[in-house]
Amino acid sequence: MFEISLSDPVELRDADDAALLAAIEDCARAEVAAGARRLSAIAELTSRRTGNDQRADWACDGWDCAAAEVAAALTVSHRKASGQMHLSLTLNRLPQVAALFLAGQLSARLVSIIAWRTYLVRDPEALSLLDAALAKHATAWGPLSAPKLEKAIDSWIDRYDPAALRRTRISARSRDLCIGDPDEDAGTAALWGRLFATDAAMLDKRLTQLAHGVCDDDPRTIAQRRADALGALAAGADRLTCGCGNSDCPSSAGNHRQATGVVIHVVADAAALGAAPDPRLSGPEPALAPEAPATPAVKPPAALISGGGVVPAPLLAELIRGGAALSRMRHPGDLRSEPHYRPSAKLAEFVRIRDMTCRFPGCDQPTEFCDIDHTLPYPLGPTHPSNLKCLCRKHHLLKTFWTGWRDVQLPDGTIIWTAPNGHTYTTHPDSRIFLPSWHTTTAALPPAPSPPAIGPTHTLLMPRRRRTRAAELAHRIKRERAHVTQRNKPPPSGGDTAVAEGFEPPDGVSRLSLSRRVH
């Protein structure tokens, strides 16, 4: 058992530098050891929840059931919980590496890389040899970068199971566009990715063309206009709206926007609608002033993109000035029970804006991609805001078919979840955080009888997978191993050989002159 004596923070004030660094190292080892034990518990829970083959082809299977419990316990998303479960299984596949991890001698980062690089190794003998080699050498590798660690691990995989080397996809297959987390202060987000060179060149020219399509009084720099032009393209615009504000601007003539099927919902407090645009959002960097002007002690409340980041009040004012449509939310007191299973558009809008994300513990799926669930199943429970909440499809299926989960809803939208193990988790509507002045409490509902348990004759049917999770995993591993094996085959011997016309070998490789065999 790994044990360590941690210094009291008060004692560290009188410690010398060497003692402080030693305390840092000891605490880091303790964190690693604690993390390893957390993964051991996750691995055991995963094993218990995935042992039922009768539900293996369910769309929400035993793995999802375990992931839901892990996500609730750690307050993380379903996807992150699933990733922790995959990582935890490495402790079972590589016991010697796991022992070092539990002792705090291998970092979580290194174990994560080992888990990924050895994922295709399935032969027990190769795994045993690889486990012993990695356990022997990993502690001596020192602080290597991720690429160097991957190469070091791959060298041992290549020795014991060459077909298990993870293949690196060529750049063309790695095409993607990624959007980073929003900057809450600036209301911006980073964008990066990889395109075909032809598409990139076309996009570059198109952005420059749009950036130069405004009048000279536009306060934005060319770089800022190019960035805004990308947003205009996403909205289906054929031109960039000029920001000069002049009524007689020649660039403002005509319709600059075309109808699109893309709508972005921004939820804002009424007080935020009166904010003034910030002229410093655009234009060159201002010169440094001797004394910065005083800023108000209280800023206008910000708005929130549905499923996205915060929109500062000045940026919201720019959007409104640019023609964004406004729709005022009805007061929840105006909402009543409805006679049908599906809520009306107004009631659904209220529930989605109130919740903002899936209401399962740790889930952050935006409500626009969620189902609206009756907490007390219809018709025992009414179609009323005090009985409705948003759940993503995965957690909706989990609640409906995995009957170990129970939930109770309060009139203010609070949900109290009880897990199969008896632990309780309380979630609140996100609007309580981002729109604190919005009163969302609705009428309390009378007590209702407990809903009937779902049995074999229940009319609802769980969607089924085409392949079980285990079969899909085996299929993917087989395909990737086959690809690696094909890639590692030696070139065919014999037959016609010739130097390709115009071929130039890489640097450091000698060119061989081959004669054509005459038959």
UniProtKB/Swiss-Prot annotation:
Biased amino acid composition, Basic residues: 477-486
Disordered: annotated span: 477-519
Family matches, as InterPro entries: DUF222, HNH_nuc
Pfam families membership: DUF222 (PF02720)
Xref: SMART domains: HNHc (SM00507)
Taxonomic superkingdom: Bacteria
Gene Ontology CC annotations of this record: plasma membrane
Protein name: Uncharacterized protein Rv3776
Organism, as annotated: Mycobacterium tuberculosis (strain ATCC 25618 / H37Rv)
